[in-house]
Regions:
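N-terminal pro-sequences and low-complexity stem/linker regions of secreted or lumenal proteins
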Residues: 39, 64-459
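Ser/Thr-rich, Pro/Gly/Ala-heavy low-complexity intrinsically disordered linkers and tails
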Residues: 1, 6, 15-69
């Protein structure tokens, strides 16, 4: 996503800015396919740890709860922001597995304080993520040039409670997940796709962009490509980024409604209306449900909140390094959460807050599961991401330590609405094996009241 001020740039400069900010590639297209790239999810299986408290709901594994599930939840709202790891936002959070000591190859340093507005983007493409991961040693960040310039150690920076007090307030009042992993070692495009489809067609990065078609998906020009992992040959190939894969709307039972709030479509630039990358939605009647973020306010006021919602910022409040300041982004999030909590819907709603990818920031916990083709260069899992679960029935003041991943969010939606797993339609989907997040809730507890917070004055 790009600042509106960049729209005044000359065309070549604007193109360079788009590609740099989004981590795009200059690949050329060899073939145009759906990009599924294979039919298996790899031979590895999830290793799910046990919560430190007794279960109060269904099995925590994605495969363990296949029968009808009775909960009071009628609405799920998934809020996706941009580019931060767990350590970056919650490394010093009490009771969570964080660290304030950052590991380099030959030394350990105190993790520096991260600035509200970062001076540059950090490399978070697939190859940079593999470098950072360094075969699970979690000490390769210094080999990426953007991580440290003039000794600022930016990639190891952290925000503490004084930097993001409202996010910390939510984490203290509700449930914070400290073992929630990205499904891909990589960037925004596949990360966003996993929230909708529990897969990304094996895409490893972002599509290239053109000035006339600055969208990530089916509306891009015919020459646009994205690199995907071909699981048949264990090589990369370039395909058109319009994937014929199932997504959550395909499995929701009749009468369960949905919307994606995140489009400023046909307003340059536009990359994170991610249903644009799913052929069956973009070129079907479901595209009418992809709307602007302002429509969420209208739907709450008009008593028309759908059962399943995704909320994604397309502007300067996305918290993406070098684009959106963190304070401004937190205020944006708080504004919408306040609306939901003050509405008639709070009593039966779950709000899930997380990130699309790691953004190039340091995290000290090695991803516990590798899948894809090559164990030395796995597709995922990626690095830990912040996860805050807010609901009257989220366990209060609870750190959810079970291993989970981006595909856990589609799995949670499926469990709440008694929908089949997407993996039953396409084995590439990762929801069938993913933790369903149910042990983050106590359906029998006294409901937690709304936590209405004040937006802050920003630097």
């Amino acid at each position: 996503m790009l600042p509106r001020s960049t729209l005044a740039l000359p065309p070549l400069a604007l193109a360079a800015t788009i590609v740099a900010a989004c981590g795009g590639t200059g690949a050329t297209q060899s073939q145009a396919t759906s990009g599924v790239g294979g039919h298996g999810a790899g031979s590895a299986t999830a290793s799910v740890s046990t919560s430190t408290t007794g279960a109060t709901s269904s099995s925590s594994s994605g495969t363990g709860g296949s029968g009808p599930l009775m909960t009071p939840i009628k609405h799920v709202v998934v809020i996706v922001k941009e580019n931060h790891t767990f350590d970056n936002y919650f490394g010093s959070f009490p009771g969570a597995e964080g660290t304030t000591a950052c590991q380099l190859k030959n030394q350990t340093i105190p993790c520096p304080k991260a600035p509200d507005s970062t001076p540059r983007d950090l490399c978070h493409a697939h190859d940079c993520a593999l470098t950072d991961w360094n075969h699970g040693q979690m000490n390769g960040w210094e080999d990426n040039a953007s991580s440290d310039m003039n000794g600022d150690h930016l990639a190891w920076g952290q925000y503490d409670e004084s930097s993001i007090p409202n996010y910390w307030a939510y984490a203290k009042a509700f449930t914070l997940g400290d073992h929630f992993f990205a499904n891909v070692l990589g960037s925004s495009y596949p990360g966003h796709m996993f929230f909708l489809a529990a897969q990304a067609g094996w895409a490893t990065g972002n599509p290239n962009l053109s000035l006339l078609h600055p969208y990530w998906g089916c509306d891009q020009s015919a020459s646009t490509v994205v690199s995907v992992l071909d699981k048949g040959s264990c090589t990369s190939k370039d395909v058109f980024p319009c994937f014929k894969i199932p997504s959550i709307p395909d499995v929701l039972p009749a009468g369960v409604t949905w919307k994606f709030y995140g489009s400023n479509f046909y307003v340059l630039p536009e990359v994170w209306s991610m249903f644009n990358g799913i052929d069956g939605i973009r070129n079907g009647p479901g595209w009418a449900n992809v709307v602007k973020t302002a429509e969420l306010t209208k739907d709450i006021q008009n008593h028309q909140l759908p059962n399943v919602s995704w909320l994604v910022d397309q502007d300067l409040a996305d918290e993406h390094p070098a684009i959106g300041a963190v304070c401004k982004g937190e205020n944006w999030t708080v504004g919408f959460i306040n609306q939901l909590m003050q509405s008639e819907y709070w009593k039966d709603t779950v709000i899930i807050f997380t990130m699309d990818d790691f953004g190039g920031w340091y995290d000290h916990v090695p991803p516990p599961r590798q899948y894809g083709c090559d164990g030395n260069t796995p597709y995922g899992l990626g690095f830990r991401l912040p996860l805050i679960i807010m609901s009257p029935y989220a366990k209060p003041g609870f750190v959810f330590k079970e291993q989970s991943e981006q595909a856990s969010i589609p799995r949670f939606i499926e469990r709440v609405f008694n929908a089949p797993a997407l993996s039953t339609l396409d084995p590439a989907a990762q929801d069938g094996q993913a933790n369903d997040l149910m042990n983050a809730f106590d359906w029998n507890q006294a409901p937690i009241p709304p936590l209405v917070l004040q937006q802050r004055s920003c630097p």
